[in-house]
Amino acid sequence: VTLHLLRRAAWPLLGTCLFGLAAAAPATLTLDTTRATPLPPTVIGGFNYGNWMPVVEAQKDLRSVAPTLLRFPGGNVGDENDLTAANFVPLKSNLELLTTGPKPPALMVQTRVFGGKPGAKNAPEDAAQAARDAQAQQLQVAYWEIGNEPDLYSVNRGDASWTPERYCDTFRAQRQAILKVDPGAKFAGPAVSNTGDGAVNFLSRFVKNCGDIVDLLTWHEYPTDGTRSDAEALSSVSVIDRDVKRFRALLDSQESNPLGYTRHTPLGVTEYSLSYVSARPRHLSDQVGALWAAEATARLAEQGVSVAAYFALQATGAHGLVDLAGIPRPTLYAFQQLRHLTGEGRPLTSDDPALWLHAAQEGALLTVLATNTATEAHPLSTALPGYQLIGGKTFTEKTVEEEDDMVRLPLGATLDLPARSLTRLVYKRQ
């Protein structure tokens, strides 16, 4: 009887041990070398910038992410303030401070559309003057974005006259005025505030009436308000996949875009962050917000978006890579990792659903970004046929809290990816 009881007791223990071994099995990587997607530089390192940002005080950190595009003046500031010649002076200085390569970051400039008060400089001739002012500073503007979040003019700003049709008329008028100054100018819009039903309706009606003249269709992504669970917040990154697909289809449909369906207009996300509530640090200046931002950026690049600008570069409430005091946030570390995702994207998958994976080939080097979304470490087999692992760095919430450098990982057949971490692995083609 005693032996029988011992055997019965041993079976659950043995099962637990076997389950533990199975759960601890390293994830394996599968790289598809037959498909390649060019990764636009103006997605990987794009940011919203405003003249209120003390760039000079944090230039070392901000240069470390190698900005590739700046959207100016960034957010609601463009709705509430005139765009004057004086605005372009600090912009030019900070553009020079943030230049890390042979060329400065590309520039997107928002024109003023919403008036809000008598005397506001939001007429077509004011947009033309802004173009002349930019030329006077020898600034090369890649895109003029006409206004900012016009879907909210009637909702948050109390002016019901701002329909999509009125915005389209304004877009045409400002565009025509700027083209007289700069015949090669390109134009972006409508920069709707989100992808809820109201904003999507606004964007769709804009496309129907202005699809023939918009050169970059833009919208903003803010899927949460910072109050969801961490798991729900991270999973909201799926909106990127959904929205890129549906807006590409919208533009290419003759029914939805009767005036411009043959143009294959590029896509742009000119503001994005996990939460839209600047006064609430949760899911903006924490690790979850950083992991979401990195994943959203990588997905935008891989899925064919041409321009993206994270909100924001610096010191905008809880938004920004560093705060007003110059203290780094997790998003700084995330974009330091992302800057290396250059060249051609290669599909990379694993058998661990907790891992987000991306790969980019540039010459003989393959860069892999691996995000562990789980709250515990997950093992990863580093083997990739035809490649040799030559380097690895990661960061966690603790890394940021202690303001440490990235954690250098030992090179081995298996790596433990820390909980809620973003790891960069570098391989060399054999």
Question: What is the predicted function of each stretch?
Answer:
Residues 2-13:
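Bacterial N-terminal signal peptides that target proteins for export
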Residues 19-22:
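N-terminal signal peptide c-region/cleavage motif recognized by signal peptidases
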Residues 24-145, 151-196, 208-213, 252-264, ...:
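Non-catalytic accessory regions flanking glycosidase/transglycosidase catalytic cores in CAZymes
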Residues 82, 231-234, 284-287, 291, ...:
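Short, solvent-exposed segments of well-ordered alpha helices
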Residues 152-165, 173, 216-254, 279-282:
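Substrate-binding surface in catalytic domains of secreted glycosidases
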Residues 205:
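Short, functionally important secondary-structure microenvironments
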Residues 228-229, 251-289:
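Active-site clefts of carbohydrate-active enzymes
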